[in-house]
Amino acid sequence: VHWTAEEKQLITQVWGKIDVAQIGGETLACLLVVYPWTQRFFPDFGNLSNAAAICGNAKVKAHGKKVLTSFGDAVKNLDNIKDTFAKLSELHCDKLHVDPVNFRLLGNVMITRLAAHFGKDFTPACHAAFQKLTGAVAHALARRYH
């Protein structure tokens, strides 16, 4: 992936303002609510019976923070995302058997949460940069499947 200086600046600028625990929890909760089939990957998370239960679930919030922390690793390693996610790709492919389409869904949900939090500050240029980032992360996570 080739990044322009503007894209790198937009991504790092916004990322520096993110509350990883809050946005991460919201992102994973939204994924589980909007795409309920993704719940099957989290059998140990307890009550995922409705949106309120999912959004209030401590395990969802904790794992969401973990997921967004991984996106932070991508932000720190924009020029080496594939290697940054090599082990996670292996885990999600070989052990967890996650369909790679879910990585793109997660990225799209994260972008909606960022847009909701940052409002007008989440400009079209910023949105485009994050779309490129989430696409690169999804591609890196799916790498082991190819």
From Swiss-Prot:
Residues 2-146 form the Globin domain. One of its GO terms (cellular component) is hemoglobin complex. The keyword Iron applies. One of its GO terms (biological process) is hydrogen peroxide catabolic process. Red blood cells. Keywords: Heme, Iron, Metal-binding, Oxygen transport, Transport. Gene3D superfamilies: Globins. InterPro entries: Globin (IPR000971), Globin-like_sf (IPR009050), Globin/Proto (IPR012292), Hemoglobin_b (IPR002337), Hemoglobin_oxygen_transport (IPR050056). It holds the Pfam family Globin. Heme b binds at H63, H92. The keyword Flavoprotein does not apply. One of its GO terms (molecular function) is haptoglobin binding. Heterotetramer of two alpha chains and two beta chains. Involved in oxygen transport from the lung to the various peripheral tissues. Belongs to the globin family. This is Hemoglobin subunit beta-1. It comes from Iguana iguana (Common iguana).
